[in-house]
Every structure is written in C-alpha cells, then in structure tokens.
C-alpha cells in the first residue's frame, strides 16, 4: 500500500477548456459522491450565480462582465444534479457551449473544482476504509518523506496553488471541505479581476488580447538569446519558468506571430497555451490589494479565506503579480524527499487537465508519476449482510502449482493439453490436461506412513497439500490460537484409484484410502477442525456446490470459517473410456468453448480450494480479503431435455435468483465465467442464458461497460469436480490484476450461437484491462446430472488504514522465521521466497515481506531458520544463502530441528526507582501493547486518576507514588499481555515485591479491575498514611548468614532496626531501615569491603515501616476477590508457594521479606531448566533470577527498551529471535503484521514447499492377453521391479544378466584372462535407470551427473542371484544408488539428472584446465597404446576407439573415435566409447617411470562426473564421431593416483568443441597383478561365500543370518514402512506410541506380521506402550527355527549370509559368544603390528589409529584383497574382508585377527 502513496502532490495551472466527456464525468462524480469535500464543492458550484452577484456588488469594475457563462454552467449542472438516472442526463449537454476562450471567471474556479474532484477520486481508489480519513494518511505520508519540517508537500502552479493551499491547510477531510470552498470562491475572484483587466485594456487604442505560449530551446540556443529577443517586444514578458530550458511567455496576441517566428528561426520550439489575460504581472498590484481586502476583512463574509493574511498574500502574489519560478520550486521539493531505504520509486500525484511537471524532473530515475483522472462514477456497492469473504486460496492444476503460475497460463492464453504422464494408465495412451506429479506426496508433513500413503487416493493426497497451502495463505497459522470451528466442504466426483487399490491385496488402508468421505475427513482431522466435514458429488459442479454449501454453513452458524473447493485426478483407463463412450469428450484436442471448431471437452485434473469467512468478521479481524462471495444459488434443470444437457430457462432463472440475493442489477456484472465445456449442444444454451440476463439489449451499454464471457476449460481442460473452483480462482486473479485474459483457442464464434447485438457480450481474444470501477463476476458451473450452481464474486471492500501509520518508518529490522517439517522444505521455501522477491512485479517493501511470511508460517513444524533483515536486498541475500545449503551442505549447517521448548517463566520486577522505561515507539508500533495500555489507562481514569499519557513516555521522575505505581503496573501488565496475546505459552509467573501484584493479575488470581483497585489503593495508603520516616533500602553482596548477621548487629547498636527485605540470591540481599540506620550499615559494609548499592526506592518496603498502613491495607485487600490461578504463580514466600490466595497473605506480602531466591529455585526444581523472560523493561529481575539458578541450561531473556543506545523495537525483535531459537512459537508483537501489506500480495506469495516422494500403487491388469508383469521394461536389460515399496522414495530395478547387450559389451574386453565389468558399464546402467525416472525431461536435454561412485565388489561373468539396482531419492532428480546382489554390494554413489536448458554448470566445471601449453614427451599410435594395456586388459579390434595419444609427466591428450562394435544401440555405443575415454588415464598411469612390470592400475571410482546430452545421443547422430580427450594427474597419495578427464567433441559440426564429458577425481590404485588376478577370479567364480570362511566378524559388524534378520530387520522395516519413522531412529527401546501408530496402523502391522512371519501377534491399546524389542521377543517366541534368532558364534564352522544394509542393534539380541568376544582384551603390540600392515597399503602418511576407518584411509576392494593376503602372511590368519562395512575400523580388524585364536603364535614372535 505504501508504494502508491505519493511523496508530492502537484496541482496544475489553469485548465484548458474541458471536453464534454470530462465535464460529464465531473458532474456525475460531484452529484453522486458522498465525500464531504465534494458535497461542499457541489454546494458552492450551485451557488455560483449568487456569489457572482455579491462579488459584482463589491467591485464596480465587474459590472461590465457577463453573467451568462456562470449561470449557464450552474443551470447545466443543476439539471444533472436533479436527474434520476445517469443515462437520462448524458445527452442533456447541448445547451452548454464550450468555446476555446472561456472567460477566466469560469475557467479559474473550474480548475480548482477539477483538482479537488480528481484528488477525491484518487483517495477513493486507494482501497482504504471510508471510515478512515485517507487525506490524513496522505498528509502524514508526505510529511514523513520530507527531510525538513519547512517546505511544501503540496505544490501548485498559478491557479493550481489555490488547490494546493486548500489541501495543505486541511488537517482532515472535513477541513478540506471548508478550504476547498474557499479556494473555489477565491478562484472566481481572481478570474473576475483578470477578466475585468482584459476588458479595461480593450478600451485602449493600442489594445491587443494577451495570450500565452510555451518556448523550449535546445543545446544550440540559450535563455539569454530568448530574453534578448523578448526585449524587442515591450509588452511581452516571461510569466512562468517551466524547466531549465523552457518558459511560458505572455504577449499581446498581435505580437505573437512575429515573436514566435523570430524564436523559431533560432531553433526555439513554441506551442500555444489557451490562457487569456494577464497573470504573473506587476500591473495586477491593485487587484491584489483589493482581493486581500475582500478576503480578509470580514470573517463572516462570503469570501472569507481562513488561511491568514500573510499566507494568502503569498499565494495571490504567485498568481497575479510575480513570475512563477516553477522549475526552482519543484526542484527544491523533489530534492527534499528522503530517498527510500528500500529504493522504492518516488511517487508524484499530478492533478488537473494540464501536465506541468518539468520534463527534466519527470524523467528522473525511479520517479513515478500518477496522473489524476475523472472516470465515470459508480454508486458504492452495499455488501449484503450474508456476504462471505475469500481470505485464502491455493491450487494445483496442469502446469500450475501456484496461483501465480495459473494466472500466467490464463494471461498468455496457454493450453495445457497433452499426453498423460508415462505409466499413469499402464501402456495405454490417453490425452488430456494432466498433472505431471500426481503421484508425489509429502507424507512426513501430514504424519502419514509411506505405506498408507501408497493406498491413499491421490485425490486425498493432493487435496491435503492444497488445503495446507490455502489455509496457510489465509493467515490461519499466523494466529496464536487458531479457531477449530472450521468446516470442510470438498467436491469429489470419480474415485479412479479404486481400480489400483482393488487390484492389489486388501490392507487396513484399502477402504480409508479410497472412500471419498475421507477426502474432506482427512483434512479436518489433520487440522483438528470441529466444523462440518462433507464430501459433495454433483458431478462436474461438485466444487461450486461445495462452495455454496460452505457459504450456507457459515451463514447458518454451522462453522465460522470454511474450506471449500474440489479435486479431480484421473488414473483409470476404463473410467476414461466410459466418459468417451458417452460422447462428451473431444478426441481431436483441447476444449474450445464457444468456438466454431468446438467438438467436446478434453478432461483435466487438478485441485482448487478457497478459505471462506463472513465478510463482517473478516474485516473486523483484519483478514486479507481477496474477493467477496456476495451470493450463491443452486437449482436443478427442469427435465425438459436430456439429463446431461443444460436447460436455458433453468440457467437464466438461476442467474436472476443469484442477482437478487446479491442485491445487484444485471449491469453490475461485467464478466461471466461460464461452464463452457466446448460442446455443440451445451455452449449455445449457456451463452444464450448469459446473454438473456447479463447482456439484454435494453441495457445501456457504454463502451467501457462491455460484458465478457469466458471459460477456464480452454486453458486447463474440464477438471470436472474441480472445475467450478477453477473458475472462482480465475475471477480472483482477474480482480487482483484488473485484467480479463484472452480465451484460449478461440478464433470465431460457434455458428449455433446467434451473434450478439451491439456487442452485448464479448469474448476476449487478448489480455484486456477490466474497465470497471466496481468489478463483479458471475461463475456458472453445471453438473452433468442436472445441477446448476451460480456464484457472484466481486472485489473486496476498501481495506482499513493501519492504526499506526508511521510504523514502517520506525523499524530498522524485521525478524523472519521460516519453518517446515523437513530441512528440504525449509530450503526450498527460502529459494521460492527469494525468487518471489526478485521477480514480483509489484514493489514489495520489507515490512510487507515480513507480514506475508509472519502470517503464513506454521511455527509448530519440526525445522526452522530464524534471522533478521534490515532491507529487502539483505532479506534476499539471506534467503538465497540459506537456499543454497540445499545443494551445498558446506555452506551452512542444516536448518535446526525445533527444540523441545523449555518451560517459560514470566518474571515481574519490583519498584527500582521513580522513573519508568517505557518506549513511545513500541507503544505506537505494537497493536497488542497499545491495546492493553489503553485498557489500563481507561480504568485508571474511571477510578479518578488522570490519564498517564503522554507523561508515561517521559523518563523524568514521577513524584506521585500513586501515579508511579499505576504506571508501573500498567507497563508490566501490558508487556506480559503482549507476549501472551502473541502466543507465548507461559508455565509459571513470578513477581519480585511489587511485581507479585502484577503477576497475580496475569495469572488470573486478580481481574484487571481488582488488581488496579489493589495497586492504586495501596499506593494511596503509602502516600497518605506512611509515617514520617520513609526508610531506605541497601543492596549488599553477601551470603544469607552474613546479611542476617549484619542486620542483627546493626539493630543491636541502637534503636533503629535493620531487616533483610529481599533474599535476591545466594550472595545478594537487600537491607531496609531508616535513612540513618542504612547510612551506618553502608559505612560498616564499606569498611568490610562489601559491595553495596543504595536503591532508588521511594520507601523502605518489607519492613516495620509498612506497619503504619497494614490495617487499612488489610481492609482494602478484603474488598477484592481472589480466583484460582489460570497460570501457576510462584509467590516469593520462604518455604513454599501459597496454595490459596487470601486477603491476609496479600497484606502480609508487603510486610514480609521477599524470598525471591527461594522461589526461583523452587521453580527450577519443579520445572527443570527454563526460559526466564522479563515482563517489563530493564528492571533487572531476570538478572536476579539468573544469580539464583543452579543449572546453566536455563535461558535468560530481558528487554532493553529504555536504553538510549538501543532501538527499543530492535530489543523486541532480538528477544523474539532468541525465543524462536529456543523453539518457541511466539509471534513478534512489536507491530501488527496484518497492517503492513495489501491483500493482493497474498495471491502471489509462494506457499509451503513440499518434500515429496512418489506414492503410486500399480494397477494389476485383468486382461489375460496381456503380460502379468506391469513393469516398464527398457530393451530387456533393465526393468523397474518396484517403486516406493517397501521403502519410500526407493525404486528397485532388476538387471537381466543374460541380456545380449551386456554380453556384447563384455565380449570385447578381457582382463587377465577373465571378465571384469568396466566402470563405464556401471555408469551406463545407472544412467538408464535415472532416465526412466525422469521421463519428463527430453532426452535431448537430459544431463547426467555422478558423485562419489565407488566400486565395492567388482562384477564379472558370474551370474548372481538377485542382482538389482536400488535408487533412493534424496532430492528432486537426485538419487543415491546401490548396485547389489544377494551376496554383496557392488557399487554405490549418487546420480543426478538435470535439464541442460535450465541448470547451471556444476561446480567442478567452473574452471576447466588449460591443456594448450602442455608439452608432449611421449606419443604413441593406436597399436602401441593398446600394447601398453596388454598386461591388464586386451581389447578386440572392433572395440578399440583410441586413435593416438600424447603424454608428458602429468598430462595425456588422445583422440578417440566411435568403435565399430558400438552398433546401432545408443546404450552399447555410449558404454563402449565411455570405456575408451577412461583408458587414457590408465595408459598414462601405466607409462609412468616408476611403474613396475608386476604392477597394474585399476580404477575403483571417481569424485564427480558430468555427461552431456550431446554425448548420450552421439552414436545416433554420426557414425564417424570423434572426440578429443584431455587427462591430467591431479593428485598422488601413496598407492592412489587421482586423474581428471575432459572430453570434447571434435570435427567440424555445430557441436564441435562442446564438452561431452567431465570426470574428476578418478581413483587409480597401484596394485600387483596377482591381487588383481584374485579380484578377477572372485568375480568369475560361482557360489562365492559372502562374508567369512574361517573367521566370524567382530561385534561391530555382526549381522544376522538370513533367518534371524527376518525378526529384527524385517520388523524394523515393517515399522518404517507403516509409520514413516527413519530406520536409524528405530531402536529396541523405541515405544510404539511414540512412532505415531494409530488403530489402522496397528491392524496393518498385525496383518503384515502374519504375512511375513506366519505368527499371530495381537497388539492391544495397552501394548502401545511396548517397545520394539518386546514385539520382536513376542515374534521370536512364536517363530519356527527358520525364523528364530540364531546366534552368530565365532568358530570356523559358522557360515553367515549378510544383508549389507541391515545390522543388528547393540541390545539384548547379542549372543553370549558375541558378548565374550566383545570382552576380549586387546593387545597393544598386536594392534601396532596390524596398524603397520595396514599402513603399508595406505601409503598416504596419514596416522593409522585404532579408530581409523579402513574406508576413510582409501582402502578399496583391490587394496583390501592385498591386505587380506598380507594378514595371512603376517598372522597366519586367512580372512575374507570384501564384505566389511564402511564403518570398519583398525580396532575391528584387530579383533578379527584375535578371534582366530592365534595369540600365542603372535606373542612368541612367529611373524
């Protein structure tokens, strides 16, 4: 809103003669506007003839002037004013003759009237509440932007200065009415004097009419030259300095032709101005004096001007006698404007029909000019009492996951028609308008298990997510205590997903997942709503009917808020065929509503939901109203036609009914959002119905009053049950943007529709402005079963002005809290918000951004980021910084999980002096604080005290203790209530001394009124009844015994007793006594070197000095009543807190000591570590509490609102941030977020960013002619076996090891006489699987990236059982992969798929190496290169692609062509070619000088790889393709050599020189030929034993046998699958109830246990407290030996089969033998020897410790084989280490050796 408030308002010079249209609009606006200033102008306009007569009576010279112009103008306006209808009077202007030279007596007052009317219309257009004075807001805004208190904010030129004076002199809009009247009268007088001077001059023989023209010169001329020419014409003069190169010249009309010709000859451009008479000339001096006499002499006279004579004279001189220095004045004004901190444009409002802002100033950067206008008037719409506000909205439609994206589709006329996503309908091809990600769901956010999500209809899942965003956009989460009285009305038609669920084995989730009642029920259940929850099915009109029911429910009181809309997802091919068979759908393309080529509708899917609330409630509660549903209506077609065809009479009747309910005329509706499905029968009927009601020929149709019709189905198809709400959302977006979008696919009208007469109804073919002052639309939705629903939606009423208009100027920083259920969602939201800020078309202030975010964040979610920003650019930088962590975890620690909030204790301080620390800035800014302070002030005044405003803001001492205590209480109360109103959950309150009275009120013991009675009455007694000795108090740093001894010793020395008043801390106490006694104590304490401080209290409280008021105070305490506390209160009593509150205890509280330390420690003992928050400011109470606390886990928060060096609002912001970081859900109460933003922003703000994963249950086919395997297959080599089962986000691919492509690739490469998979083959298979999961990315732009690929157990020719590829999604288009079989894990890493068109280059490609300067030391032709490889591998000729290679010490450059064996298969060609690329690095390694003949190099993995789309399709493009390969040795670590390889396309094509592949960090391990031979043999030998042959593993990598794993690991997997709990979070001690299991989950796990273990386990509600360990034990007790827990023993006969992914927990499941092995002592000498052996295989110089992990030391599969051999040589132990876990340490390896029983040999030095 602030962006549209002008910094300067400029009133132009005397108007040109207005056009008839302008006069018409002016008269209509003056007639119909209720604004006070226009009522006054209307009255003076009607009285012009009478005023003119009085004026003529005062000046004889006016007698010669004609009365006709004024009388004619008045009479014309009078006819217009008394006319009944606008249409009747629009043509009654013929008698008003508009001449080019109207007299000044008419033009001058008309100028002021136009200025005031345009200004008034501008105020109306701000969208602010009529009850607020918009003019006041304008004045404050322009004042706050001006750097000086002196200088105008309203500027006027010539007659315009009168309008500016009226605006500037008016503090309110009511005052403007008086000043506008004065300005019009004054303009009449000025015009009369100018006209009379013209008439007098005409009597001269040399008279010539004075006229004006503008002169503008360029660079080849100058002002001096112009002035020199003017000197030749004595009567000509400069009247206005318009710009630095432009002036207005007034001259006799007879001189003008020659003068203008002279100027033009010198290159000066001239333009005439229709102003007649002599303004800005000294000859008008007498007229000036006469005017001053007329307007200042008689306050009761008709021409009195209430501006003061000096001010009036200044204005009159600027018009009559002095040249106008307009350019200087405007330059000074513009320069006085303070630059906006957020670099928002400076805005100037220009009023009048003549533009007068100097062009050079108008062209300044970031200078935005708004020009006043007079548009046709409209009567204010009176919203019915039953009006329903739309306060939130969200959607998900084809191509649009947000409302902004949906508008982009509408505005561009896009069509989302296309084929269904792959696999949606099996192998069938279906066209329509589809969501690309209907299977995606954020199960974690909604607390739904992955397995349950799998069985849920996607309509339920998508409705949940869209509901969350709609509720979020409504500000529901911004409320500290959201109301649960919310209804949920969802329209749902088909439930296609039933086919998917019913074709699979029934589960406990099958019914709840497919029943349509659960679509609405789940939403209500998640939000804990108690209002009606209803699913509605009226076919295609379901969502509109749901909105109708929701509005009715609110009106009837069934709920106070409602969520309404609809959802439609298609997944059943038979259902689609059924609809097609009915002849409804269009088989030729998209919907074409009302078009000549319409042949039926195309189906669509999506979801749209809106949040509704009664309009009156929404406005009073400050909700952001996006639009208003003023009426809804439903009926049924009368049956006169086919049931699926609409009936004209039924539809037109419905329109009339809904108009009647809305109290609207048909002409008020300017847009009809039709059902418009594009059918030949339905479209003409609907069009005719709309035209009959909204476009009748008898209705007056101005050009701007055109009625448009359209249908959203042209863009997104017929979304059936979600179609009605789609139309509603379209209207909301049209209201936001003020535009009517084009109808997609429309070229010509359906010939069956009769053409409209006089353009009554139009169909937009381009984006058009919605040219109505009041915008209303009717949405029609028809159901195929005959239901008609109509909804009228109109613009929201004006928004109320913020109660604190200068809030934004007082704030320097805003706090931001970003929350989500997962880290991924937090970061995605940061990115989305940063992009919104960067691309938002409307200027957004930091305050608006804060408001938007504050109202939408759900503070109860698990993860959060909190920070402050002082400018919009800083906010963007912080958001971008946090968002980048999503890709680079080194940038930032991940978003912290929301902490378990410590109990919060509110601490109220005592009286610390006679001054207060209360900030006016905080009071002005905070709605919550101000509301509570005002409440206290009102009650205090009712009790007879004066208001404490504004004295309470002063930091001067308050002498009257009654005022002091009432203020102190009010401040503490207001601060505490501000925190509570902001949603702070308080567990305990505690008050020190006086603060305990406030704490009693906040806790609920005392009402506010009773508390003030007690506080004020007590203060009155202290002031009036206290003894002569006031007393004094002294703080002493000494322990309790010392304080009591000091008090006793002083009391024993004289009559004055000393008491301990406050036990503040272990070493902090306050003594109280007479002034003399305290002075003596202070002296003695100083002698004893004790730290003391005299307190600035007014009296000696908590001492015998209080006795003087005790009796009367007791009487007072008996007057008030005491309640049980709502918030627990800890009283500062000695041994225990008060159980009940009595008058006696309250009275004694003022007399007895304050045992604050004791009370604080009791709170700590009861609640544990707490957050201690001060209720007030700078009292030091929380610091005292800190001294008494024993645990460092307590957290202290204190506001510093009175420090002169601290911005008080910043202190509130900082404290809020501290509380957020401690896990609190409190809001920042320093300002009211709803005041800072316009509702239109809420339709564009990004919603919650879901962390989704696919959940789609395949539909088993019943067609016996089709394959029983529904899995998509690619060339037979790799097939998708399972998706998202049993683990979420996991896709499992089976590999056909007998496929020809695999055999063909391996056939041409022999490694040491055997087969070993090349690294390229692993990459190829993984790439293909990733491509299958990202079919939405065109292959032509699909970019594949790998990270951290590592070969664990190499593969060869051995056919392995269960060989599969597992991909687990970790991010969008990013998967962690594992190639594994039943016996081993073979390769791991990460694969990422990007779209080359949109992705940025990976980091490792940011700086490519320069190979141009490499010096060649050795070159080898093709044959020599392969000869070097022969000691490792031999390649058949057809598989060779290396043409030549050149090398030096660390670099190799080679040329590679496509090998002949590539054939026609892209997969085969890419794999074989990629293998040739990798050979370049291997050849370089083999060629090094220190390479031994018995050594070879094997690649075990790499760091990062990027494969371009060009390379992936190279084999298809050109059989003669060649590449240039550059390789460099980037690092050398012992036996490990790292290489980087870059491949560029060679040749002369357009792709030449482009990067095909980049591979960095390839690890080549130097190993012996014999070690590699072992690897080859192992990879080619059938029936390998997976883990050990003779040695059992140590406890650190104990793994269950196949049978035992089926209890623990399968149980854990089942629980993970059903609850969504992460595997790593499930331990034996995990309690079932803590995993979020409900009754359905219990039923499902019982069924799954029966299915897996064949045992019957019943889990009762009592068992919900059981642990996972107990459940496993119960299963074990019933299982057969094949399923039982089998202990793993450490002897040579034990053979184990390991699951690489599941380890036993360290729990009671460990066997006895395992425990004994764990307890074996480790021998230091043996450990050293093992470490030395390992070190020889590492060779990196890194220290090898017992805790060192083998994996981190670089021991890959090849190195492990050599280590295995060396262990046998050194220790006589044969161990197989290939299956060791990645966490295996040196200590674990040592334990393996020890368990072989060879310690004796080692100790005897056998090795």
UniProtKB/Swiss-Prot annotation:
Acyltransferase keyword on record: yes
GO terms for MF: 3-oxoacyl-[acyl-carrier-protein] synthase activity; fatty acid synthase activity
Region of interest called Disordered, as start-end residue ranges on this chain: 1690-1720
Start-end of Low complexity biased regions: 1692-1710
Active site: 540 (for beta-ketoacyl synthase activity), 675 (for beta-ketoacyl synthase activity), 718 (for beta-ketoacyl synthase activity), 1304 (proton acceptor), 1475 (proton donor)
EC number(s) stated in the UniProt entry for this protein: 2.3.1.-
Span of domain Carrier: 1605-1679, 1721-1797
Domain Starter acyltransferase (SAT): 107-280
Source organism, top-level taxon: Eukaryota
Cysteine pairings via disulfide bonds: none
Gene3D superfamilies reported for this sequence: 3.30.70.3290, 3.40.47.10, ACP-like (1.10.1200.10), Malonyl-Coenzyme A Acyl Carrier Protein, domain 2 (3.40.366.10), Polyketide synthase dehydratase (3.10.129.110)
Domain PKS/mFAS DH: 1272-1573
Keywords, comma-separated and alphabetical: Acyltransferase, Multifunctional enzyme, Phosphopantetheine, Phosphoprotein, Repeat, Transferase
Repressor is among the record's keywords: no
Family annotation (InterPro entries): Ac_transferase_dom_sf, ACP-like_sf, Acyl_transferase_dom, Acyl_Trfase/lysoPLipase, Ketoacyl_synth_AS, Ketoacyl_synth_C, Ketoacyl_synth_N, Malonyl_transacylase_ACP-bd
Domain notes: Multidomain protein; including a starter unit:ACP transacylase (SAT) that selects the starter unit; a ketosynthase (KS) that catalyzes repeated decarboxylative condensation to elongate the polyketide backbone; a malonyl-CoA:ACP transacylase (MAT) that selects and transfers the extender unit malonyl-CoA; a product template (PT) domain that controls the immediate cyclization regioselectivity of the reactive polyketide backbone; and 2 acyl-carrier proteins (ACPs) that serve as the tether of the growing and completed polyketide via its phosphopantetheinyl arm.
Protein name stated in the entry: Triacetic acid lactone synthase cle1
Organism (species): Aspergillus versicolor
